[in-house]
């Protein structure tokens, strides 16, 4: 199993989760931004769910004058910057690793949700 080189906060609503929600925070935030997500959702009682909340890597963000902050990819000013901003491929690999890890932990692919803000 590939390693994840960032903090990942995991919350479970019960033992032996049958589904997992991987949720990504927004620019400059961290994994604790959605720590209250399980309590905010009107989840069915008795269905154990694992919430996987990873931190984005620290990187310079062009639109914020190059300030180093958590971001899944660089955001620039140029509308013609291309289809793959710096960092996007690395973040996609990280998401694939997290999805693979959940499958290896016994959660079926059909019961994995990847989302974010």
Task: For each feature predicted by the language model, list its residue ranges.
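Serine-hydrolase catalytic machinery in alpha/beta-hydrolase-like enzymes
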Residues: 2-113
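The Walker A (P-loop) glycine that initiates the GxxxxGKT/S ATP-binding motif of P-loop NTPases
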Residues: 116
């Amino acid at each position: 199993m590939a390693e994840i080189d960032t903090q990942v906060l995991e919350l479970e609503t019960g033992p032996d989760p049958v589904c997992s929600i991987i949720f990504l925070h927004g620019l400059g935030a961290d994994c604790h931004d959605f720590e209250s997500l399980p309590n905010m959702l009107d989840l069915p009682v008795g269905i154990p769910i694992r919430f996987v909340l990873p931190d984005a890597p620290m990187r310079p963000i062009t639109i914020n004058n190059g300030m180093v902050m958590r971001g899944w990819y660089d955001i620039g000013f140029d509308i013609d910057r291309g289809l793959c901003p710096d960092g996007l491929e690395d973040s996609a690999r990280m998401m694939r690793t997290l999805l693979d890890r959940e499958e290896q932990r016994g959660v079926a692919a059909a019961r994995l949700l990847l989302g974010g803000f």
